[in-house]
Regions:
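Short histidine/acidic/glycine/proline-rich micro-motifs that form metal-
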Residues: 17, 45-46, 145-146
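Left-handed beta-helix
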Residues: 84-95, 109-196
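Conserved core of the sugar-phosphate nucleotidyltransferase
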Residues: 20-106, 118-119
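Gly/Ser/Thr-rich beta-alpha loop segments that engage phosphate groups in nucleotides
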Residues: 17, 105, 152
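A structured beta-alpha segment of the ubiquitous adenosine-cofactor-binding alpha/beta core
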Residues: 1-4
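Active-site acidic Asp-centered loop
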Residues: 13-14
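Short aromatic/hydrophobic "clamp" motif used to bind/position activated sugar donors
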Residues: 10
Length: 196
């Protein structure tokens, strides 16, 4: 199917996440770095690191190592974000931070077509590690709100948060509107009004 369409870049997006990312920044960094693959990442703590693909990047944000759901303490330690990189990213002094794959990727056309024609069947276990090994692969570090809502628990908790007075995810941000069909618009919100 992809062979019949002309495109330069292909996005892989997960359908079970809640976030508000400016994709123009991701593609801008991808082009600037002359990347073949860009992986969106988010800083996570040590406890969460075992549930994600974790990567180590250099000062230019090029991915140097990738481990899918690391379990061994020594391996996890080796993937910790270095102090210099934490400072460059403005992440603060917490030493136990790791860069987790968000399941959001940008591929150059030729690279994606090569992997689609391969025998690989699992994206996280086969394609991403091989692409990082063989291609110019970079991390786009996202520091906004992101929640994986792929389990009943996380979906439920995200819905409870969305119903709170000040939810972590802002559905009413005028700088980042949510475009959808009218029947799916968020509820009305009234600020600074007095009701008699």
């Amino acid at each position: 199917h992809f062979h019949n369409h002309r495109f330069d870049y292909l996005w892989i997006l997960s359908g079970d996440q809640l976030y508000n990312m400016d994709f123009s920044k991701v593609i801008g960094q991808h082009i600037k770095n002359d990347a073949e693959v860009t992986v969106a990442t988010i800083p996570v703590d040590r406890e969460a690191a075992t549930g994600f693909g974790i990567m180590q990047i250099d000062a230019d944000r090029q991915i140097r190592e990738f481990v899918e759901k690391p379990q061994e303490p020594d391996v996890i330690d080796s993937l910790r974000i270095p102090a210099e990189t934490r400072n460059d990213l403005g992440l603060g002094d917490d030493e136990d931070q790791y860069l987790a794959s968000m399941g959001i990727y940008v591929f150059n056309r030729d690279v994606m077509l090569k992997y689609l024609d391969s025998e690989h069947i699992d994206f996280g276990k086969h394609i991403i590690p091989e692409a990082i090994d063989q291609c110019r692969s970079f991390s786009y570090v996202y520091q906004g709100y992101w929640e994986d809502v792929g389990t009943i628990r996380t979906f439920f908790e995200s819905n409870l948060d969305a119903a709170s007075e000040l939810p972590k995810f802002n559905f009413f941000d005028m700088e980042a509107p949510i475009f959808t069909r009218p029947r799916f618009l968020p509820a009305s919100k009234i600020n600074g009004a007095a009701i008699d």
